[in-house]
């Protein structure tokens, strides 16, 4: 009795609830729009087709297995199946795609320097021909209740939409990792095959024998049913990918789309889809790819956090962070103090040119010449139109302070003599980053403008929080910094007695590490409430960025209190403390759900 409703209660509603629970903290406005849009399209498109199948006797339902209410002869349970299947598959695709910067998978197919782009055009045509044949062939095989009618109806109904979606989204379908394209198709498909097998065996629904081919994938699972669930999940995921393709184009190319709202309109999405691939800016795509590579390699905490920032804010934050890391690497890895100083000068000249109202494109390109090719691609995309210049110059001051460790006499007169020196250094290299990040947050705010007092308060708190994160970084890297001849623990704190043994010195260093860590947590506790005053769309990402880094501090604090070594690696760089991947993900999810760590 009411077997169809029981199928939902036992098999479809629980995974939908589970996915909702996992995704709820991570949902963005675009995710919600995507779900609502796909549900509307899927249900609207399926109702006429399903109604025809039932009215012509291809599908039947024993009266005792359904509750009774129908729409166009479709049982309420069947209508709910359209909704719940679409919802489950959509949520899975959104979850699996959170880490992807989709714009990095776009290609200009006319660019001779991009061989993959040219091959994509060939695959596009091959896919169109294949899908076209799959659509035309059933139409040529006749109509009526003959063997294979159900399969023909599936193909005639689904393939035109698949052809359209392939034409729009083939680039992403071919280049995205399979875990983002095939996995969200196959997981729900396999699950629904099992459910369908159980339902067919129990007689919850059945297919008329003269309308099917008589082939079973396994006992009780007809080939048509297997194809139906595979095709419908493919429709859903390809539709989602087409949406992602449109949004990626809108976000990636401000030259064509200067303003993109938080939730793009259908008309704007179509404009993104119809933009010719020959107009895609290859240099911008490659620069973004290089920036993302730098981010993934240099900061796993910020890489995790970037996945919950929306749209163009995410892209610009990646570009900003990549600029900072490129500068740090070129200056830090210089073979001599003189070479490092030269790099600081080159970056200063680059900023002078980028922010000058008098410089032209030729002067800008000339300022990039001294840099490596990959660095040029990153620097070229720095969003200077949205960033104040002073924090970037202050960042260079921090690098200059770093270089004083390698000048003659630095051992007797180190650059970090007092806590004020340490505070100044952290302000240069980290408080500036907090200010720059929040500048981007306010520039991209899709809601009403924030009042100036709140903005100033949040930017000040963000700068302080940047210092706190830098203190955690300093505590973590004491040993690796020492190997390169640097010590950021204020020199005046140390006992200058020559009689100090290595054991005493180690205890002293551990004590000062804890002292700096305590200062970091004090600043963190004082300023973290300001995050809740930021624009709503960015709060979650900022929370994750801060908490992911402070979790390193918590692990350091725990180990200091237990007297354990601090060079543990949670999967990161050897000799450098880091948080294991699963713990980082757990912290990120809990933070998005509203959790706040201990201060």
Where are these regions (language model features)?
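Aromatic-rich, lipid-facing transmembrane alpha helices and their immediate juxtamembrane interface loops
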Residues: 1-288
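Transmembrane alpha-helix/helix-exit interface in multi-pass inner-membrane proteins
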Residues: 50-51, 193-198, 470-484
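Catalytic cores of Mg2+-dependent Asp-rich isoprenoid enzymes
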Residues: 253-468, 475, 479-599
């Amino acid at each position: 009795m009411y077997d169809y409703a029981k199928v939902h209660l036992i098999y479809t509603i629980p995974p939908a609830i589970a996915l909702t629970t996992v995704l709820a903290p991570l949902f963005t406005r675009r995710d919600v729009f995507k779900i609502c849009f796909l549900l509307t399209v899927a249900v609207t498109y399926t109702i006429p087709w399903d109604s025809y199948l039932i009215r012509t006797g291809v599908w039947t339902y024993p009266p005792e297995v359904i509750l009774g209410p129908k729409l166009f002869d479709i049982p309420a349970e069947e209508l709910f199946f359209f909704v719940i299947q679409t919802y489950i598959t959509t949520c899975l695709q959104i979850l699996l795609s959170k880490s992807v910067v989709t714009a990095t998978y776009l290609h200009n197919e006319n660019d001779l320097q991009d061989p993959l782009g040219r091959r994509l055009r060939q695959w596009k045509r091959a896919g169109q021909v294949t899908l076209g044949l799959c659509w035309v062939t059933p139409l040529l095989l006749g109509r009526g209740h003959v063997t294979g009618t159900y399969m023909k109806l599936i193909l005639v109904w689904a393939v035109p939409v698949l052809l359209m979606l392939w034409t729009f989204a083939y680039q992403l379908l071919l280049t995205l990792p399979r875990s983002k394209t095939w996995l969200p198709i196959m997981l729900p498909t396999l699950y629904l095959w099992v459910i369908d097998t159980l339902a067919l065996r129990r007689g919850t629904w059945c297919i008329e024998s003269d309308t099917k081919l008589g082939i079973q994938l396994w006992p009780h699972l007809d080939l048509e049913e297997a194809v139906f669930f595979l095709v419908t999940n493919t429709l859903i995921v390809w539709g989602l990918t087409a949406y992602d393709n449109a949004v990626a184009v809108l976000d990636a190319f401000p030259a064509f789309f200067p303003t993109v709202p938080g939730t793009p309109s259908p008309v704007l999405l179509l404009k993104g889809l119809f933009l010719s691939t020959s107009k895609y800016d290859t240099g911008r795509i490659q620069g973004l790819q290089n920036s993302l590579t730098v981010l993934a390699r240099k900061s796993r905490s910020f890489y995790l956090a970037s996945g919950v920032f929306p749209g163009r804010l995410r892209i610009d934050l990646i570009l900003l962070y990549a600029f900072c890391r490129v500068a740090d690497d070129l200056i830090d890895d210089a073979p001599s103090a003189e070479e490092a100083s030269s790099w600081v000068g080159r970056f200063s000249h680059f900023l002078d040119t980028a922010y000058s109202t008098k410089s032209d494109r030729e002067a800008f390109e000339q300022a990039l010449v001294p840099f490596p090719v990959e660095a040029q691609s990153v620097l070229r995309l720095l969003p200077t139109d949205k960033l104040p210049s002073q924090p970037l110059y202050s960042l260079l001051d921090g690098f200059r302070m770093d270089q004083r460790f390698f000048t003659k006499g630095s051992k007797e007169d180190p650059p970090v003599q007092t806590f004020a020196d340490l505070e100044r250094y952290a302000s240069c290299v980290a408080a500036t980053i907090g200010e720059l990040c929040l500048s981007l947050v306010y520039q991209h705010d899709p809601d009403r403008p924030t009042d100036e007092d709140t903005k100033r308060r949040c930017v000040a708190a963000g700068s302080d929080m940047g210092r706190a994160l830098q203190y955690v970084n300093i505590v973590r890297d004491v040993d690796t910094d020492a190997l390169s001849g640097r010590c950021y623990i204020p020199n005046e704190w140390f006992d200058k007695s020559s009689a100090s043994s290595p054991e005493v010195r180690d205890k002293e260093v551990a004590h000062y590490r804890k002292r700096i860590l305590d200062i970091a947590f004090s600043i963190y506790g004082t300023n973290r409430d300001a995050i809740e005053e930021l624009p709503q769309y960015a709060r979650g990402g900022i929370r994750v960025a801060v908490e992911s880094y402070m979790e390193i501090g918590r692990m350091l604090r725990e180990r200091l209190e237990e007297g354990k070594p601090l060079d543990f690696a949670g999967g990161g760089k050897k000799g450098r403390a880091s948080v294991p991947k699963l713990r980082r993900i757990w912290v990120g999810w809990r933070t998005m759900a509203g959790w706040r760590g201990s201060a």
